[in-house]
């Protein structure tokens, strides 16, 4: 049994929900290509700086901007923070795999980490949380969910 935990921002907990549904035998909208014994330990939606500090227990880098305590990083910063989130949630939950997602300006950052492997990727859609319309933000979110699950599958193979 592979234990997975997520700390999500721009994917709003949908990665965790999809993993849980798959593990229980009723996958949602994602077409899984692996057959793995997986369990979701925890799925956290953490869009704010205060949430990172109080729940994930690390001091995040200073963002480019904030919107009501919601962190807005550049794409490069998102990659770094997603990795920090994935490492932290994995450690705090004693999971085998940790997943972190965050997106402010650009394609966002998506990280999956295990004891001996770490990978960081981006969604396929650029947007800016400060200025993009809802459709662009939601397109980036859908892309991020798919990309995160595809990356997770590469760890499960």
From Swiss-Prot:
Pfam families associated with the record: HcgF
**Family annotation (InterPro entries):** HcgF
Reading the lineage from the top rank, the first entry is Archaea
HAMAP family assigned: UPF0254
**Family according to the record:** Belongs to the UPF0254 family.
Protein name in UniProt: UPF0254 protein MTH_1148
Protein species of origin? Methanothermobacter thermautotrophicus (strain ATCC 29096 / DSM 1053 / JCM 10044 / NBRC 100330 / Delta H) (Methanobacterium thermoautotrophicum)
């Amino acid at each position: 049994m592979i234990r997975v935990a997520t700390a999500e921002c721009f994917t709003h907990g949908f990665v965790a929900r999809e993993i849980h549904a798959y593990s229980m035998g009723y996958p949602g909208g994602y077409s899984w290509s692996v057959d793995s014994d997986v369990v979701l330990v925890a799925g956290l939606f953490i869009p704010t700086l205060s949430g990172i500090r109080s729940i994930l227990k690390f001091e995040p880098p200073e963002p480019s901007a904030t919107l009501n305590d919601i962190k807005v990083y550049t794409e490069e910063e998102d990659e770094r923070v997603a990795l920090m989130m994935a490492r932290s949630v994995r450690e705090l939950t004693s999971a085998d795999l940790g997943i972190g997602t965050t997106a402010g300006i650009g394609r966002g950052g998506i990280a999956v980490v295990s004891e001996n492997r770490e990978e960081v990727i981006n969604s396929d859609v650029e947007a800016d949380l400060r200025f993009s319309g809802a459709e662009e933000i939601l397109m980036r979110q859908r892309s991020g969910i798919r990309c995160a699950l595809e990356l997770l599958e590469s760890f499960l193979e």
